[in-house]
Amino acid sequence: MTCGPKGDGPDVAGTASQLSDPKEDLMVPPMLDEESFKAKPLPVLQFRTPVFFLDVKVTDAANPQSFTFQLVDKRAELEALMSEMQSYYAAEGSSTFPRGLPEALLRKGHYYAGYHSDKIWYRVLVQKVQGPLMASVYFVDYGLYGMMLPSELQPLWQRFRRLPVQAIHASLAGVEPLHEEWTPKECITFREIVNGKIFLARVRGKRPDTTTGVHDAEHLVMNLVDTAPEGDILVEEVFAERCALL
């Protein structure tokens, strides 16, 4: 069983990223030429130090040392962007490449609009090209990983690049596995406790995010507090109690 998101796959020789100049063979609109070929990164949220508090919603959880969250006070902005993306890519947004992104335009480290099997468009980052017809992607606003075909991708136009990446990678402060790695049961237990829920986060520190591939993103180290009516509950304490019963 895989406890955490992997996002990477085996290296494949002869990927699309090795093509010298696909613009010679494709009619590329000037706006796409500027945005897609230069791999301009999306903006990211920056956080002050030292200790501070945030209202967060956990969007995905692998284990206590690897989970992602969104800021609750940014949810309205993300929902507005997602709504606009659905309308745009259902019509003129896909008109440049009606059959999907040409394989020659698929690049590691570039951002695209990706059409998921749930019939929703998302902002995605290509982490690895797995051959000419498959890409490993990271859903930058939700912290999820997946695989997509070029036919499921479209250019991410400038109007959808202004909002900073909304999924932030994090870990619980002072929590380590009893052994070298988290067990599958511990991973499942942690996910059941936090996934999809809102907490008060007490941020203890930060470091560069080396997991997601998002340029200049930060990884936050925090305590998660469930502000229940009967009193504050620390997630790490609940997790320790549940693990003792496994």
Regions picked out by a protein language model, each given a short descriptive name:
Residues M1-L246:
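Intrinsically disordered, low-complexity segments and flexible domain linkers enriched for serine/proline
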